[in-house]
Curated annotation (Swiss-Prot):
Cofactor needs: heme
Subcellular localization, as worded in the UniProt entry: Membrane
Binding site for heme: 472
Keyword Cell membrane: no
Role played: Together with an NADPH cytochrome P450 the enzyme system catalyzes the terminal hydroxylation as the first step in the assimilation of alkanes and fatty acids. Preferentially hydroxylates hexadecane.
Record-given protein name: Cytochrome P450 52A6
Source organism (scientific name): Candida tropicalis
Length: 524
């Protein structure tokens, strides 16, 4: 066939709009990759190894992640040991050659993303992922919006606010009643912890608890009737499930927006609006009077702004951060304590010395300050957060062309070029289990390691609460609440044990935070 004939036969297809768009995209993609290659060479950067399971499109791992995410089995699917197959535990994948995703676990890169090169990265599409539930809050905003949110919220986590552990005691009493209903039986304590933390969080944030721990089994009437109370906890959980799926979908988040998600968001917003409107109807004098009986997050925010949307969004942002993370920490701590009676006994000795146990418990002596004396308790919580960080996977998006210090090249020692728009995912779960940071027993639950000199030099190899400018404002709040709860349980219950056939390592479920996939079954 003559050249002219070939051109004539191809011309109708070449002029079609979809062909033109495809060719233009291909030209743009090739030119962008060439430019990035030249920039990387100038900066003496080299790519890390390409993820073997990604294929040339890079889409198959994302599809598989979304699929198993729907079954709540993401942590079981993602092979954490995969990082050991690559130099410096770093590799990358590319979505159709356009979107670069670097996955890393080493502390030098985590430090760069979160601190030393903080301004080079943003939350990327997180705002779009989370907006339907959380709106514009501290965990969804970047830039000036984030700075304003942080300045508004920082005073709310001052020592005077987080130190009031006495507000937890009424909820502890109900939790203990629920546990005692299962005396001599194996039961799921994680389910109780999640109900407990939604009760304490709503009281701290809204001024009234939703009392989800109250049920017909206790035979105790709910102290107050709140519109939407019964649906709140379930709706909140379901909404977070969909938020996580949207997050793992990256730029395809908009495909996850079913009616159930929208309905659950509406139920959560209904309750939040109820409390916000109630607070806004109080006079400044009434707010001051109510604040005298105990600290309430919402009442303090009302003194700074009377914008109902700002109040609702910030409250729900803090709710997401404060409720599930603490419940997960408590659940995994009890899971390990039930497996290690020797650790429980040693902890009970420390609690007995400081606060008494059983009928000789001196509950009134448990304060924010006195809990700091319990060094072994602190070590147990540190070890729990090491092995089971609340947010095991996180990511940032490059706002400009930048670099990561290590992970590139065949030996993983070269810097990596990160083009603008690329994603850097850092997997803290794996960081906390690297032998080079924690030794040969990195996969073992051993609180004693926190009394060893090596753990004083961990730096960015231990980041359960993130780090840098966006370090978690509520970390001390969460640790104080967890410390108080465990101390009181140790005082009230002599032993805790787990079934002999309990699965280990435990199956983990990742939504926005990590929890035990099958529940934490113990006997107390």
């Amino acid at each position: 066939m003559a050249t002219q004939e070939i051109i004539d036969s191809a011309l109708p297809y070449l002029t079609k709009w979809y062909t033109v768009i495809t060719l233009a995209a291909l030209v743009f993609l090739i030119s962008s990759n060439i430019k990035n290659y030249v920039k990387a060479k100038k900066l003496k950067c080299r790519d890390p190894p390409y993820f073997k399971g990604a294929g040339w499109t890079g889409i198959s791992p994302l599809i598989e992640i979304i699929k198993v995410k729907g079954n709540g089995r993401l942590a079981r699917f993602w092979p954490i040991k995969t990082f050991d197959d690559y130099p410096n535990h770093t590799f990358y994948m590319s979505i159709i050659g356009a979107l670069k995703i670097v996955l890393t676990v080493i502390q030098e890169n985590i430090k760069a993303v979160l601190a030393t090169q903080f301004t080079d990265f943003s939350l990327g599409t997180r705002h779009a992922h989370f907006y339907p539930l959380l709106g514009d809050g501290i965990f969804t905003l970047d830039g000036e919006g984030w700075k304003h949110s942080r300045a508004m919220l920082r005073p709310q986590f001052a020592r005077d606010q987080i130190g009031h552990v006495k507000a937890l005691e009424p909820h502890i009493q109900i939790l203990a009643k629920q546990i005692k209903l299962n005396k001599g039986k194996t039961f799921d304590i994680q389910e109780l912890f999640f109900r407990f933390t939604v009760d304490t969080a709503t009281e701290f944030l809204f001024g009234e608890s939703v009392h989800s721990l109250y049920d017909e089994k206790l035979g105790i009437p709910t102290p107050n009737e709140i519109p939407g109370r019964d649906n709140f906890a379930t709706a909140f959980n379901t909404s977070q499930h969909y938020l996580a799926t949207r997050t793992y979908s990256q730029t395809f988040y908009f495909l996850t927006n079913p009616k159930e998600f929208r309905d659950c968001n509406a139920k959560v917003h209904y309750l939040a609006k109820y409390f916000v409107n109630k607070a806004l109807n109080f006079t400044p004098e009434e707010i001051e009077e109510k604040s005298k009986s105990g600290y309430v997050f919402l009442y303090e925010l009302v003194k700074q702004t009377r914008d109902p949307k700002v109040l609702q969004d910030q409250l729900l942002n803090i709710m997401v951060a404060g409720r599930d993370t603490t419940a997960g920490l408590l659940s995994f701590a009890m899971f390990e304590l039930a497996r290690h009676p020797e650790i429980w006994s040693k902890l009970r000795e420390e609690i007995e010395v400081n606060f008494g146990v059983g009928e000789e418990s001196r509950v009134e002596e448990i304060t924010f300050e006195s809990l700091k004396r319990c060094e072994y308790l602190k070590a147990i919580l540190n070890e729990t957060l090491r092995m089971y960080p609340s947010v095991p996977v996180n990511s940032r998006t490059a706002t400009r062309d930048t670099t990561l210090p290590r992970g590139g090249g065949p030996n993983g020692t070269d810097p990596i070029f990160i083009p603008k728009g690329s994603t850097v995912a850092y997997i803290v779960y794996k960081t906390h289990r690297l032998e080079e940071y924690y030794g040969k027993d990195a996969d073992d639950f051993r609180p004693e390691r926190w009394f060893e000199p090596s753990t004083k030099k961990l730096g960015w190899a231990y980041v359960p609460f993130n780090g840098g400018p966006r370090i978690c404002l509520g970390q001390q709040f969460a640790l104080t609440e967890a410390s108080y709860v465990i101390t009181r349980l140790v005082q009230m219950f002599e032993t805790v044990s787990s079934p002999p056939d309990v699965e280990y390592p435990p199956p983990k479920c990742i939504h926005l935070t990590m929890s035990h996939d099958d529940g934490v079954f113990v006997k107390m």
